[in-house]
From Swiss-Prot:
It comes from Sphingopyxis alaskensis (strain DSM 13593 / LMG 18877 / RB2256) (Sphingomonas alaskensis). This is Phosphoribosylformylglycinamidine cyclo-ligase. It is an enzyme of class 6 (ligase). One of its GO terms (biological process) is 'de novo' IMP biosynthetic process. The lineage of its organism: Bacteria, Pseudomonadati, Pseudomonadota, Alphaproteobacteria, Sphingomonadales. Belongs to the AIR synthase family. Keywords: ATP-binding, Cytoplasm, Ligase, Nucleotide-binding, Purine biosynthesis. It catalyses: 2-formamido-N(1)-(5-O-phospho-beta-D-ribosyl)acetamidine + ATP = 5-amino-1-(5-phospho-beta-D-ribosyl)imidazole + ADP + phosphate + H(+). Pathway: Purine metabolism; IMP biosynthesis via de novo pathway; 5-amino-1-(5-phospho-D-ribosyl)imidazole from N(2)-formyl-N(1)-(5-phospho-D-ribosyl)glycinamide: step 2/2. Pfam families: AIRS, AIRS_C.
Length: 368
């Protein structure tokens, strides 16, 4: 009897839903994208067991390393549903790199984690290309990452992203709350849109209100609603880093989850309070649209969305003009939005009647 007829079936990884060759093809496709992010200290070649970075080659003398990691939240679900994958990588880098600059740190290198049920190289390449673009905007090298193909873990077409960024700052240049003082001025840098927070509410509104995402936005007929919502998060690193090195910036707050109310207090000492005047900048039309569609109260706006301010910059009154001019010279839109005063650590946002669709003068407060 031929023994081969009695032998058990031979299983392969591919039969289980994982294609090693597809993964290898992806690495070959994205390697040039990573190499394009090279910077002093990193060669950004992929394929090894780990990535190297030379702090001395990057020009640091007595640095502290600063690390951050984040994701894109449920904005990713909207990207998957709409087939718009070419901006979420910028979002991913922005959420990490902007968190580093608020410590005074220069982003140095980035790693990503891409997980999916079945690898689609066209989608994955588009995502990694946008991560590489984000790294260029932040001035950091894409030195590695992980692509995980996990059958049964995700629905068809779904994927998840996580980013990890490491930066460095000279020991004597770390931004802490120690420099913030009563009388300091709060400048706001304009956001590029919703950024990457509040999308669970955005998606709920889209479903409940029956938005036609592929149609021109009601507030701007020149742009599709989906494009307005998916605008990548602005990366502020290159605009802020030179000013951080001058010592003129006392503190920075990245306006993410928790909005203005909860993020500004994170950079204040226990004895100081931030006062923000919502009348000092015009509410972006996209934010006004979201508020009107959801009948959202001003306080809820101030703790859910960035409301048009992606980064808060705290400076001394004497440096307001110089810092504003320097930021505007590199393309930032700058508003004087508030001040720091003595009081319990926290933030109060106030507005007059009609500001943010209010029916009367209003005030929203959060104590940290």
């Amino acid at each position: 009897m031929d023994s081969k007829h009695n032998s058990p079936a031979s299983y392969t990884y591919a039969q289980a839903g994982v294609s090693i060759e597809t993964g290898n093809a992806l690495v070959r496709a994205i390697a040039p994208l990573a190499r394009a992010t090279r910077r002093p200290g990193a060669d950004a070649d992929l394929g090894g067991f780990g990535g190297f970075f030379d702090l001395r080659a990057a020009g640091f003398a007595d640095p502290l390393l600063v690390a951050a990691n984040d994701g894109v939240g449920t904005k990713l679900k909207l990207a998957i549903e709409s087939g718009r994958h070419d901006g979420v990588g910028i979002d991913l880098v922005a959420m990490c790199a902007n968190d580093l600059i608020v410590q005074g740190a220069e982003p140095l290198f980035f790693l990503d984690y891409y997980a999916t049920g079945k690898l689609d190289n066209d989608v994955a390449t588009a995502v990694v290309a946008s991560i590489a673009e984000g790294c260029k905007q932040a001035g950091c090298a894409l030195i590695g990452g992980e692509t995980a193909e996990m059958p049964g873990m995700y629905s068809d077409g779904d994927y998840d992203l996580a980013g990890f960024c490491v930066g460095a700052v000279e020991r004597d240049r770390v931004l802490t709350s120690d420099k913030v003082a009563a009388g300091d001025v709060i400048l706001g840098l304009a956001s590029s849109g919703v950024h990457s927070n509040g999308f669970s509410l955005v998606r709920r509104l889209a479903a409940d209100k029956g938005w036609k995402l592929d149609r021109p936005a009601l507030f701007d007929q020149t742009v599709l609603l989906i494009d307005a919502l998916m605008a990548p998060t602005r990366i502020y690193v290159k605009s802020l880093l030179p000013l951080v090195k001058t010592g003129k910036i006392h503190a920075l707050a990245h306006i993410t989850g928790g909005g203005l109310l909860e993020n500004i207090p994170r950079v204040l000492p226990k004895t100081l309070h931030a006062h923000v005047d919502a009348d000092s900048w015009e509410q972006p039309r996209l934010m006004a649209f979201l508020q009107a569609q959801g009948n959202i109260e001003p306080e809820e706006m101030a703790r859910t969305f960035n409301c048009g301010i992606g980064m808060a910059v705290v400076v001394a009154e004497a440096d307001v003009a110089d810092v504003t001019a320097a930021l505007e010279a590199v393309g930032e839109t700058v508003f004087r939005i508030g001040h720091i005063a003595e009081g319990e650590r926290g933030c109060t946002v106030t507005g007059s009647a009609e500001t943010w669709s209010a029916r009367a003068d209003w005030s929203a407060r959060h104590n940290a």
